[in-house]
A protein has these predicted regions:
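Amphipathic C-terminal alpha-helical segment
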Residues: 109-112, 129, 154, 173-191, ...
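Hydrophobic alpha-helical bundle segments that form small-molecule/ligand-binding pockets
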Residues: 92-94, 127-135, 142-169, 207-217
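N-terminal intrinsically disordered/low-complexity leader segments
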Residues: 1-21, 212-217
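Helix-turn-helix
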Residues: 25, 32-71
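Hydrophobic alpha-helical segments that form the core
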Residues: 164-184, 196-203
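Hydrophobic alpha-helical connector segments
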Residues: 71, 85-116, 166-173, 215-217
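Amphipathic alpha-helical packing segments from all-alpha helical-bundle domains
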Residues: 86, 112-121, 131-157, 198, ...
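Generic hydrophobic, amphipathic alpha-helix propensity
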Residues: 19-31, 47, 72-76, 80, ...
Length: 217
C-alpha cells in the first residue's frame, strides 16, 4: 500500500508550469553552467540536467544554444538596469543620492555575485560571443553612463566645482565599476562588494567633497 500511495502522490505532482517559469529555470541553469564550465563548455544537455528538465523542454522554449545564451545575457542586463534605475529617475532625490544608488546597485548581491560576474566576463572574454555581448549590453551601459554624466554635471553646477566635466567623471566611474568587478572575480580574498563600494565612494568624495563627505562605511 505504501508503494501505491507514493505512486498516487507522484501522479498528483504538477508536471507543467507557466512558460515564464520554465524559461527562468533554464536561464538560471544556464548562468550556473557558464559559471562552472564557461560558454564553450556549456551544452544544452548540461543546462537541461542542471534545470532538472528534459531536452525537449529546452528545445521548446529556446530553439538553440545561441538563442538561450542571448536570452540569458539579456536577462542579466535587464536585471541590472531595473535595479539601478529604481532611484536614478526619482524626482525627489538629489543628484548625489541618485549616484549613490547607482553605486550600490552595481555591487548589489543579486547583481554582483561571483557566479554572475563569471558569466559577464565569459561573454566578454570569448571572441565568438563578444559581438553579442556588445550588442546587448553596450546600449544599457551607455544609458547609465549618460545618466551619471548628467547627474555629475548637476553636482558640478551645484557645488561650483572648477575644472571638472561630468562626462569625464562618468567615464572614470564606469572604469572603476569594470575594474572592481574583474578584481572581485580574480581576487575574491582581496576584493569584496563592501570594499569596492568604499573605494568608489572615496573617489567621489575626493572629487566632490561637498556632496559625498561622510558616506564611506
Amino acid at each position: 500500500m505504501g508503494a501505491n500511495m507514493t505512486t498516487i502522490t507522484d501522479e498528483k505532482k504538477p508536471r507543467t508550469a507557466p512558460p515564464e517559469v520554465r524559461r527562468k529555470q533554464l536561464i538560471d541553469a544556464t548562468i550556473t553552467c557558464i559559471a562552472k564550465n564557461c560558454i564553450s563548455g556549456t551544452t544544452l544537455a548540461a543546462i537541461a540536467k542542471e534545470a532538472g528538465l528534459s531536452m525537449g523542454l529546452v528545445s521548446f522554449h529556446f530553439k538553440s544554444k545561441d538563442i538561450l545564451l542571448s536570452e540569458t545575457l539579456k536577462y542579466l542586463t535587464e536585471e541590472h538596469r531595473e535595479l539601478w534605475m529604481q532611484d536614478a529617475l526619482c524626482d525627489n532625490l538629489s543628484a548625489a543620492r541618485k549616484l549613490r544608488s547607482i553605486v550600490d546597485a552595481q555591487f548589489h548581491p543579486r547583481i554582483c555575485s561571483r557566479k554572475k560576474l563569471a558569466v559577464w566576463f565569459a561573454f566578454f572574454g570569448e571572441a565568438a560571443h563578444r559581438k553579442s555581448y556588445r550588442a546587448t549590453s553596450s546600449q544599457i551601459d551607455m544609458e547609465r553612463q549618460k545618466v551619471c554624466a548628467s547627474l555629475f554635471s548637476d553636482i558640478i553646477a551645484e557645488g561650483s566645482y572648477m575644472g571638472m566635466d561630468g562626462e569625464n567623471v562618468a567615464l572614470t566611474l564606469e572604469g572603476l565599476f569594470d575594474g572592481f568587478w574583474l578584481n572581485m572575480l580574480m581576487y575574491p580574498a582581496k576584493f569584496s562588494r563592501e570594499e569596492s563600494i568604499r573605494q568608489v565612494l572615496a573617489y567621489l568624495e575626493m572629487m566632490f567633497p561637498q556632496h559625498f563627505a561622510n558616506q564611506i562605511l
